[in-house]
Amino acid sequence: MESAWSSRGTSLGSSDPQLQRFMEAEVQKQRVQLLIHHMTELCWEKCMDKPGPRLDGRAELCLVNCVERFIDTSQFILNRLEQTQKARPLFSERLSD
């Protein structure tokens, strides 16, 4: 069913640029939500030994560090991808010369 939706979405998007941008934005939102869910699960498993009525200092610090490392890593990856994409057109141009 997903492939049927994807093929319909692709054909609609190619005929309507506004619809295509909307669909891309929705897919991006879904990816962000999945990433947040995964990060929450990962940090929870790493930092929470036994849930209680309040976070103790150690668990709070662990959660903060976990989220900060996740953000740092994500930013690093995005920067690296951006550098790679900037370098790719130069490489493609050299091949066509």
Swiss-Prot record:
Keywords: Chaperone, Disulfide bond, Membrane, Metal-binding, Mitochondrion, Mitochondrion inner membrane, Protein transport, Translocation, Transport, Zinc. One of its GO terms (molecular function) is metal ion binding. It is found in: Mitochondrion inner membrane. InterPro entries: Tim10-like, Tim10-like_dom_sf. A motif (Twin CX3C motif) lies at residues 43-66. GO terms for biological process: protein transport. Disulfide bonds join C43-C66, C47-C62. GO terms for cellular component: mitochondrial inner membrane; mitochondrion. It is a peripheral membrane protein. The twin CX3C motif contains 4 conserved Cys residues that form 2 disulfide bonds in the mitochondrial intermembrane space. However, during the transit of Timm8ab from cytoplasm into mitochondrion, the Cys residues probably coordinate zinc, thereby preventing folding and allowing its transfer across mitochondrial outer membrane. Putative mitochondrial intermembrane chaperone that participates in the import and insertion of some multi-pass transmembrane proteins into the mitochondrial inner membrane. Also required for the transfer of beta-barrel precursors from the TOM complex to the sorting and assembly machinery (SAM complex) of the outer membrane. Acts as a chaperone-like protein that protects the hydrophobic precursors from aggregation and guide them through the mitochondrial intermembrane space. Heterohexamer; possibly composed of 3 copies of TIMM8AB and 3 copies of TIMM13. Belongs to the small Tim family. This is Putative mitochondrial import inner membrane translocase subunit Tim8 A-B. It comes from Mus musculus (Mouse).
